[in-house]
Amino acid sequence: MNFKTENSTTPNGDWSQSKAFTNSGSSFPVLNGTCELDQENLALSNSGQPESIFTQDSGLHGIDVAAPSDITDLNNQSGYQYNNNLAHDLYFTGSMEMPTTQHPYITNTNNHLSYSNSSEEFSPIGNNMSPDSTGGANSNNFTSGNKRKASNESFSPLSGHHYGTESGNNNNNNGTSRSSQSSSHKSRKKLLDEKDAALIARDDSELTEEELQMKRKAQNRAAQRAFRERKESKLKELEAKLLASEEERQKLLDELEQIKKQNISIATENEILKHNGMGNINNDVQIGNLSSYGRLQVDKFNFPKTQKDFIEHVLQGTNHQLKDENKDKVYNDNQGHKLLALGAVWDYLQIKAEEADLDFNSIDFNDVMEKLKGNEKCHGYGPAYPLELVNEAIESSLN
């Protein structure tokens, strides 16, 4: 800031003790009640030198200072004084005591103020340059020994605030308020239901038009409430049925899975048994080929079921042919021996089984057929077998 002097007779406009200065560039004077320039306290000294601390070129934060007129020395007190004739509350007048110790603000050859950080005692915050608050207009002296102390009301981020406690208290208060609101709502609803019931129970002839309208509204509310209750009851019933059906469905799925596993096990066992059975049949065939009879052994359960199967099985591997009209023929040869065609042999076997009260499957037809092969008699009616040979084959198969 630049300091300018008015009514100056010196060439450079230097400021002296006989001249006062004011701050014309700001609404606040340079030295007001708190003597704050950018939150810093300024200590001035008069060295008695013709050079002024503040010159026209002196820079003090861009604030212009002017001394409009001379000031008088009050009570012959030393130090810088301010004009008492200026009738303004913001101007300070009186003497200023200078500190005896080294000032934090010193002047250099360029007439600029500099601040020394050598001591914390004279820091701008440590020194209180404000006038005595208890003194009147005639005792506004500056004191530098008083230091500003932090009051109990100074700002602190956590002063007066207990965030965790308040948060817990707020949550508890919210829960309490919600529960109280819920209980109050239930009590109001119950009271309203009782009023509606009492109003509905009254006779229409006893009610006024307004009360009749209120009764209709109460009836509507009661009907809606009953509908909601039925709906909720039905919904709960359906939910219970759905839950039961889901449980039953899960049980059925588990049983089905077990049955599938059992089927797989049974199918595997059947395949193993089938494979073993085919192996046994092949072994029987091989043993039959090596037998002394030199004939193919057939499983005893593979016997013919019909007359046709019996005839085909007997004629298999021979050159004989049997006509259908001669298959059941029974006749005598030249020596008087009775001969039976293949069809007649089948019927005779059935008769013998019935006479002996035997099961049809008890006769080994394979053995009978093997004994009959090669003993055919031909007389123009196809292959035929003597009755004596057939009886011998039946007796041998039964034994």
From Swiss-Prot:
Subcellular location: Nucleus
Primary location class: nucleus
Gene3D superfamilies hit by this protein: 1.20.5.170, YAP1 redox domain. Chain B (1.10.238.100)
Keyword rRNA processing: no
Polar residues bias spans: 103-145
Region (Leucine-zipper): 235-242
Domain bZIP, chain residue ranges per copy: 210-273
SUPFAM superfamilies linked to this entry: Leucine zipper domain
UniProt cross-references to CDD domains, sorted A to Z: bZIP_YAP
Region annotation (Basic motif) ranges: 215-234
GO process annotations (BP): positive regulation of DNA-templated transcription
GO molecular function: DNA-binding transcription activator activity, RNA polymerase II-specific; DNA-binding transcription factor activity; transcription cis-regulatory region binding
Protein keywords: Activator, DNA-binding, Nucleus, Transcription, Transcription regulation
Ranges for region Disordered: 1-21, 103-197
GO cellular component terms given for this protein: nucleus; RNA polymerase II transcription regulator complex
Residue ranges, compositional bias (Low complexity): 167-184
InterPro entries: AP-1-like, bZIP, bZIP_sf
Function of the protein: Transcription factor that confers fluconazole resistance in S.cerevisiae by activation of the PDR5 gene. Can also activate the transcription of S.cerevisiae genes involved in 4-nitroquinoline-N-oxide resistance.
Similarity comment: family membership: Belongs to the bZIP family.
Protein name: Fluconazole resistance protein 3
